[in-house]
């Protein structure tokens, strides 16, 4: 069983490219080291949006425990050290695993 968290960000105007460069440099490495899998990541330049999903083994409670350990990790602290405010709004929710007939993935 995996738990998936959908993360939708509205970025600060003018920070789209800088945020993507930062995210690409840090998040795959730091999240993976903490036990997460990045399922996908998409940017929508026209609306300054960035949408991605991260998952971890286990149920909702296991995900939260993994997330709590990640939040206080030195790797995360290094990734965010000196980072300017680039996200104006966060929308973070757990996603249901919905199986649709005829759709693979």
List each language-model region with its residue ranges.
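Long, low-complexity, Ser/Thr/Gly/Pro-rich intrinsically disordered segments that act as flexible linkers
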Residues: 43-48, 84-105
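Active-site-flanking beta-strand signature of metal-NTP-handling nucleotidyl enzymes
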Residues: 4-8
């Amino acid at each position: 069983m995996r738990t998936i968290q959908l993360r939708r960000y509205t970025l600060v105007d003018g920070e789209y490219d800088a945020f993507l460069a930062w995210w690409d440099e840090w998040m795959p490495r730091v999240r993976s080291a903490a036990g997460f899998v990045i399922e996908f990541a998409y940017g929508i330049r026209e609306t300054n949006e960035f949408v991605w999903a991260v998952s971890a083994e286990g149920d909702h409670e296991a995900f939260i425990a993994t997330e709590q350990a990640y939040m206080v990790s030195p790797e995360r602290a290094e990734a965010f050290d000196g980072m300017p405010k680039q996200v104006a709004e966060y929308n973070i929710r757990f996603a249901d695993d919905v199986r649709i007939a005829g759709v693979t993935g």
